[in-house]
Amino acid sequence: MSKGNEEGQAIPPEGQDGERAQEKRLSRGKFIAAAGAAGAGLVAAGAPAAMAKSWSKGSRNKALTANQHAPGMIGGPTGFPGAARYQYPANSEEGRAVLAARALRKAGKAPDTLVVQALNFARPQFENKFPAGATASIAGIWERETGIKLKFVETNPASEYATNIRNASTKNGSFDLVTGAIEDTGDYAEAGLLRPLDDYVHKYRPSWNDPKYGYAGGKPTVQLFTQYNGRTYWVAFDNDTQPYVYRSDLFNNPREKAAFENKYGQPLTVPKTWDDQAKIAEFFNRPKASTPLYGSVERKCPFWGIVNWEHRFLCSADPNMFYFKPDGSANVNNTAGIRAAEEHLRSLGWSEPGALSKDWLAQYQLFGAGNGVQGGTFPNVTKLIQPANKTLDKGFGKYLKTDVQPGRMVNGKLVRRTVIFYIISYGVNAFAPKSHHEAAYLFLQWAGGARMYTYLTANPGGYQDPHHTISFNDPLVIQEYQPQPVRALKEIIPRSAPGITIRGAPQYNQALDQELQKMLTKQQSPEQAMKNTERRWNQITKRLGTERQAKAIRASYAAFPTKGRYGPNSPIK
């Protein structure tokens, strides 16, 4: 990042600082602010009062109906009410990217087409027009503004890792942009598949650390979402910070509240600690009721279940309990690891029949049918379980609220940690033609910029979730995810921690997963599960090179929440 300007800012116009100054300059008679969406139940929201005053009746109607950009904006979507919210000036992360890509194309230094590897459920958000009236999709806007086409090649979560490890070994340069999860970062970087992006980040200054346009949670979130071993490899296109979901109608029922307090001697409220969570799970677990209730429906199945051990483990120290010690050795065969395993096992008793083989979709079905009381899951739970989606919502989606995962009291402080699980990311394929690299990065900065990415995540066509601060005030995002869960995300992201992202992450995760599954199927005790995990993790580290792994482990600590990020101490309203 350049010195003398805030990170993510261009050279300040008229002696002012960055993108916020640019907005102020344009708003004085030139900038047409974000319009509230009309039509399908949307209301005006999120536009600063000073900008709203700049509307005249004529200019407002013109901007809302014409297929053109608002004054001062050089690009972005058009054709629908509120499109100006996602348009951008030249002095913005999107503006810098699109102007640079256009210049590269004109100079013959960019390809005719960028080939983008994308997950099957992410691709539609790039290619589907949204909302009604939009003149182009995300891909169409990019081509219109730069002259560079996009070609998508699909993969899926089940095969993406193996495919890309094979791409690395064969040095496959037939595609320009790599997709993956942050758990894959270490392996992809060490295999040479991902090109480090720091030179482009320095040159084009994305606004990731900007207080207004940046990632919610600031610098630790940026490091968590984009970096490995101190270098930038990804641009984040997702937010799989796991919220804690609960049935608000049950928690607010006067009869249930009175019965709970009578039994446990404390009020029924959203659990702040894992001890609270266990009491609530026990209380509401009613498998033989006319509508069966299961008290704790976070996942226990292979792959999807390990995150629920991680939530419990990480909150055992202030500010975090780490998976590995600074010397690279495993840090799980201890009180924190064993307790997390014991709680994970105990929770199985409050789960639905067959829980050991049921994934997140089965969990969504439980919530939608009114059978699930509480449990951690993905942010799009309230986006998908809505009345319009009769496949999932059987009348209970309206009661689903979210909060930060429960935690523990540590030295008088309430430590609550949510773990990022998966998160779709994109990087530049190091084996693609070098002449494609810069344009490939510029597409990521543009599509992953605060304005354009907010627009992308509001599109109901896919599962890429919001993580920029401004996204949480956007009417279309709020409409899709629901108001309370969007407010909760603002609190969840700053308290989010990574899973294992160093080289060999899939091997470490598989070892933990297998030992937890043996425990859940009563083949071994929680103590033995952690002892075996420690042994296997240390073997993996030794095989990959202890000194090298330890260096990456120490660097990874910067991606965890910092000291002082406690609570919240009351439910998020």
Language model: regions and residue ranges:
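Short helix-initiation/N-cap motifs at beta->coil->alpha
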Residues: 154-164, 272-276, 355-369
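Glycine-centered hinge/linker elements that transmit conformational signals in sensory
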Residues: 276-283, 320-357, 401-408
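Conserved N-terminal structural module of periplasmic/extracytoplasmic solute-binding proteins
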Residues: 3-5, 14-26, 31-193, 204-212, ...
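A structural signal for short loop-to-beta-strand junctions that line the ligand-binding cleft
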Residues: 167-168, 173-176, 206-251, 411-419, ...
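C-terminal lobe and pocket-closing loops
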Residues: 69, 74-90, 95, 99-101, ...
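C-terminal capping/gating helix-and-loop segments adjacent to ligand/active sites or protein-protein/ligand interfaces
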Residues: 55, 65, 72-73, 117-118, ...
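Extracytoplasmic/periplasmic solute-binding protein
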Residues: 45, 223-238, 242, 272-330, ...
